[in-house]
Amino acid sequence: NVNGIRACLTKGFKDFFDSIDADFFCIQETKMQEDQIDLTINSILEDYNQYWNSAEKKGYSGTAIFCKEKPLNVTYGLGIEEHDNEGRIITLEYDKFYLVNCYTPNSKRELERLDYRQVWEDEVRKYLKRLEESKPVIYCGDLNVAHKEIDLKNPKTNHFSAGFTDEEREKMTELLNEGFIDTYRYLYPEKEEAYTWWSYMRQAREKNIGWRIDYFIVSGSIKDKIEDAKIHSDILGSDHCPIELDITL
């Protein structure tokens, strides 16, 4: 989650982008319309195919995938009108897998979007299961939930906070119960203080008072193909840090 891609590009993201040389970059919260793509972005992405799904509301939400190999097919959204005006999902289809990049809606303060979030989660889970009927799925992005107490610094004081409510955590449990794998916890089940998001308040990042709310989740059928899952907490430029999945398919 870049929290605005144009601002992030000036804060070290380009150096990270160049150094890691990934096959895919999945970006959330681009805050950008496709007609705003300029020469700066295109020069950075010259070796990549670009796929953007922007929100109807300018400067809000949005997702993008940059990939070296062209997909067989690209799908924007879930195909459900009420869920598809905020640019939150892009799916790329390849011979051996689907890649789904997602920016899950935040339940917000006072949990004003929690009811909507619950409906969203159910529809996404059904969508992923439908895809999985034909080939394995890699599902990634800012999923806006810390699943277990180990996934945030202060669980006791956040039980009613957006991102750690019982309802949101239960939806993640339901997804994993369908056979999907949280790749980071699959490899590092006991690793503490492994976070991907920090508030801008109270020097949270410097003190590592964070949450793990960004994920790579894969179909159980390809869990043995996972080589590593990494959190790049040293990369600045957003309130989130990049995460990485190394997998051979």
Please identify what each model-predicted range represents.
Residues 58-74, 192, 201-224:
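Conserved beta strand-loop-helix elements of the APE1-like EEP
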Residues 24, 46-49, 120-209, 213:
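Metal-dependent phosphoesterases centered on the DNase I-like endonuclease/exonuclease/phosphatase
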Residues 1, 17-36, 99, 128-149, ...:
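Active-site beta-strand/loop signature of hydrolases that rely on acidic residues for catalysis
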Residues 1-43, 49, 55-61, 76, ...:
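N-terminal, active-site-proximal structural segment of metallo-dependent hydrolase catalytic domains
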Residues 6, 34-36, 59-60, 107-111, ...:
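Short catalytic/ligand-binding loop motif for oxyanion handling, primarily in non-cytosolic enzymes
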Residues 31, 39-107:
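Structured beta-strand-rich core segments of catalytic domains in phosphoester-bond hydrolases
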Residues 68, 92-95, 219-220, 245-249:
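Active-site beta-strand termini and strand-to-loop segments that position acidic
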Residues 79-80, 105-121, 156-160:
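Surface-exposed cleft-lining segments at the edges of enzyme active sites
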